[in-house]
Amino acid sequence: GGCCSYPPCAVSNPQHC
């Protein structure tokens, strides 16, 4: 959920996802 479910955010934060 959250950022990792939103592709641009997941791509920008791979260390989080």
Swiss-Prot record:
Recorded GO MF terms: acetylcholine receptor inhibitor activity; ion channel regulator activity; toxin activity
Tissue spec. comment: Expressed by the venom duct.
UniProt entry keywords in alphabetical sequence: Acetylcholine receptor inhibiting toxin, Amidation, Disulfide bond, Ion channel impairing toxin, Neurotoxin, Postsynaptic neurotoxin, Secreted, Toxin
Region (Ser-Xaa-Pro motif, crucial for potent interaction with nAChR): 5-7
GO-annotated cellular components: extracellular region; host cell postsynaptic membrane
Subcellular localization, as worded in the UniProt entry: Secreted
Disulfide bonds: 3-9, 4-17
Cysteine amide: residues bearing it: 17
Domain remark text: The cysteine framework is I (CC-C-C). Alpha4/7 pattern.
Function: Alpha-conotoxins act on postsynaptic membranes, they bind to the nicotinic acetylcholine receptors (nAChR) and thus inhibit them.
Protein known as: Alpha-conotoxin-like Vn
